[in-house]
């Protein structure tokens, strides 16, 4: 995939969910946004509005998963409806869905200091990184103009890594988190926080 002509993108992770708060792995299952998650989505919507970004200037896309759809609706402030795209769903964690990192360590012996991606790579029945990479690359290749993308933690990092023309060995160099907006244009990444908008 060539990223030389990729349009400007703003990538947003869904707001905090009940399972995020409890430390449970969601993967391709859902849990509702917490009050904090709703607040994060509304703040990100205000940040975009302050930057002059709306459904009139950018195409909005979202994962079809409930936590992302709810975040997208709050971010968009009822301007329009985001286009749902299954390629933006979160990576599956297979049989680890719904359990905590401590439970995973107890079952597998993974080191407490293991990087979070090591857990995804070891998830029994989970989606391989190659599958996530392929669907993210396919999604990006289809963009025709500036876009706002509401997705998930690991999917967000893969999208941004590919958009910057980096190899996946650098995916862990990008920040994650909720309540921030990631901007990629001309292969350059910037994290926009509520204090910076």
Q: Where are the regions a protein language model picked out?
A:
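Active-site-proximal alpha-helix that buttresses catalytic centers in soluble enzyme cores
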Residues: 4-80, 107, 124-127
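Generic beta-sheet signal
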Residues: 9, 58, 142-154
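Short glycine/proline-enriched coil/turn segments at helix->beta-strand junctions
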Residues: 76-81, 141-147
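Domain-level recognition of soluble alpha/beta enzyme cores
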Residues: 163-192
């Amino acid at each position: 995939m060539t990223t030389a002509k990729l349009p400007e993108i703003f990538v947003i992770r869904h707001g905090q969910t009940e399972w995020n708060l409890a430390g449970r792995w969601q993967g391709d299952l859902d849990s509702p946004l917490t009050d904090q998650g709703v607040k994060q989505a509304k703040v990100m919507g205000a940040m975009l509005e302050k930057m002059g970004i709306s459904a009139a200037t950018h195409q909005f896309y979202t994962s079809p998963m409930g936590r992302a759809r709810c975040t997208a609706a709050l971010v968009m402030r009822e301007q329009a409806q985001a286009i749902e795209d299954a390629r933006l769903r979160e990576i599956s964690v297979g049989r680890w869905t719904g359990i905590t990192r401590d439970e995973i360590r107890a079952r597998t012996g993974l080191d407490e200091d293991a990087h979070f991606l090591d857990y995804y790579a070891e998830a029994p029945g989970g989606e391989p990184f190659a599958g996530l990479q392929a669907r993210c690359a396919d999604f990006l290749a289809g963009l025709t103009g500036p876009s706002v993308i509401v997705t998930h933690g690991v999917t967000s990092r893969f999208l941004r890594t590919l958009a910057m023309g980096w190899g996946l060995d650098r995916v862990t160099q990008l920040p994650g988190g909720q309540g921030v907006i990631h901007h990629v244009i001309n292969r350059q990444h910037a994290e926009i926080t509520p204090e910076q908008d």
